């Protein structure tokens, strides 16, 4: 039995499977070796010369591009997940009972009809006289005329010039033709 030495090779890499023997691209391994010795060195034998076997540049560029695109996709996914978590936390903080009580307690100019103060007096004379003289009567919050649609002159039909009979030319009293010279 003949004893052969085991040549330990490095584990094959993914790109090494694409390695080719392109003479114009590679360096020379050794000049004076046989084909078998060249293959043991992991090189490529071509026309009596042993060349190094490497991965072409286009394969390296393609693999780099794949790695970059994958990295960008992963970073984008992580960013969106973080933004979604922040948005959910913000919504959950806004919906806490304390925040909702604070929000509903302060509404100085509410347009909600159920909360709007009425224009008629809410207190009768009997409720005002039953108070002690040391307690000052409190007034109901008044609405701002600039924001209240009921007192807005632009929407008030009594002050609208288009419907006001005093300024309407169709209902204006006729003038005497002698007053207007031709």
Swiss-Prot record:
Cysteine disulfide links: none
Keywords: Membrane, Transmembrane, Transmembrane helix
Signal peptide feature range: none
Compositional bias of kind Pro residues: 171-182
InterPro entries (alphabetical): TEX29
Membrane-side (Cytoplasmic) residue stretches: 78-182
Protein name: Testis-expressed protein 29
